[in-house]
Amino acid sequence: MGGFVLAIDQGTTSSRAIVFDGAMRIVGTGQKEFPQIFPQSGWVEHDPDAIWDSVVSSIHDALARARITAGDLAAIGITNQRETVVVWDKDTGKPIHNAIVWQDRRTSAFCETLKRDGLEATVTTKTGLLLDPYFSGTKLSWLLDHVEGARARAEQGGLCFGTVDTYLIWRLTGGKSFVTDATNASRTLIFNIAEHGWDEELLALLNIPAAMLPEVKDCAADFGVTDKAVFGAAVPILGVAGDQQAATIGQACFAPGMVKSTYGTGCFALLNTGADRVVSKSRLLTTIAYRMDGKTTYALEGSIFIAGAAVQWLRDGLKVIGDAAETGRLAAEADPGQPVYLVPAFTGLGAPWWDPDARGALFGLTRNTGPAELARAALEAVCYQTRDLLDAMHKDWQNGEDDMVLRVDGGMAASDWTMQRLADLLDAPVDRPSVIETTALGAAFLAASRVGLWPGMDAFARAWARDHRFEPVMDAETRTEKLRGWRDAVRRTLTAG
């Protein structure tokens, strides 16, 4: 057995591969971006072959930088963008359509029809989710209805459905493994999180044939072995989790009441609720945090669709910055007397508002508003939305401790200005870990602990290390005024008024 573990982190805009050694140190990385496809307003797609090519390229780069070969790997862990739908031919492996991405809103009208028919309560009771285009089920139904012959082929067992993890495992194993894990399954809108299986009633509701669904496993399990012809060596795939659940694991949020927030393209906060499957009264999601040895740990999740993507918009859309790294410096230079609010509802608003038809808006603009004020507004929007999520979580689940500490990760967590403003607006400490690649770390832990290369959960939690703690310094009056302005801006953006 080799002494290294490979984490594949397949994201929304790029794929990453990270090699860890037996001491949990990063020894090699690779990253490859791939194109985003926008066929219509509100539609977002990926070419599955482009996803695959980016994964292969990043793996080759990571192994080369680690100065090892595939044969030196003890195991592979996979983490991935969730909810994104891929459908492919079981015999040829060829996708029948581009992947429909989690950000895609094309099924908004279908979701509204189902809501009007009074079906959301049934969906939420079974899945912990809401009837929103965000999740996989309505996307899959759309594909079956709009790709010629797809439904008949699916009913005959000729098509495979998967989230991105399933598609990658299929290709890595040369088509031998058709599997997913409980966390990815829990995001599909057709998986019953209480009974731990695909739900016949929901499949009938969305007219999805059960024959096209993968087997669901624990997060740490035997997912298959890579095909030597594809990968260069036969390496076991032993860990899989959706990206936000993998980050929860990588942050060692194993105790009920612990909460983490990941800042990438979107922002996602998860609160560990242990064995307690909390029914949210604040339109948060009840989801599976992880499933180990057949035991399910649940979480409350709040999903923000636009976080780092707002900074990309400043760079690529408005062209007011040249590089994302400039944003924090610019924000620090903003005029404190000019309160500008950005509500980044570019693809609707997520939790706790769930308004798919809301669109982005800027408030408070004057003739003196410039790039600095826009940069501050973009970064503060992420902080305000996080505050909304955590307020809703604590309203739903009273078992958490009053002295909450938020563990953060993702690209935006590297910004000292943003993390300080986050602590200020939360009125709570924010901890940034020493290993910022927590999503990949979580996937690596699942695989490495199963193969015996790394320790178990207790020892892993003790090894978690903090890089920096940001303590709140903003006075209560300023914080209250800023939050009031934000909530007024959101209210004016919502389509319901």
From Swiss-Prot:
Tell me its family: Belongs to the FGGY kinase family.
Q: How is its activity regulated?
A: Inhibited by fructose 1,6-bisphosphate (FBP).
Q: What class of enzyme is it?
A: transferase
Binding sites annotated in the UniProt record for glycerol: R82, E83, Y134, D243, Q244
| Entry EC no(s) | 2.7.1.30
**GO molecular function terms noted in the UniProt entry:** ATP binding; glycerol kinase activity
> Its catalytic activity?
glycerol + ATP = sn-glycerol 3-phosphate + ADP + H(+)
Which of this chain's residues are annotated to bind sn-glycerol 3-phosphate?
T12, R82, E83, Y134, D243
Which positions bind ADP? T12, R16, T265, G308, G411
- Entry protein name: Glycerol kinase
- Residues that bind ATP: T12, T13, S14, T265, G308, Q312, G411
The alphabetical list of record keywords is:
ATP-binding, Glycerol metabolism, Kinase, Nucleotide-binding, Transferase
What organism is listed for this UniProt entry?
Allorhizobium ampelinum (strain ATCC BAA-846 / DSM 112012 / S4)
Which biological pathway? Polyol metabolism; glycerol degradation via glycerol kinase pathway; sn-glycerol 3-phosphate from glycerol: step 1/1
| SUPFAM superfamilies in alphabetical order | Actin-like ATPase domain
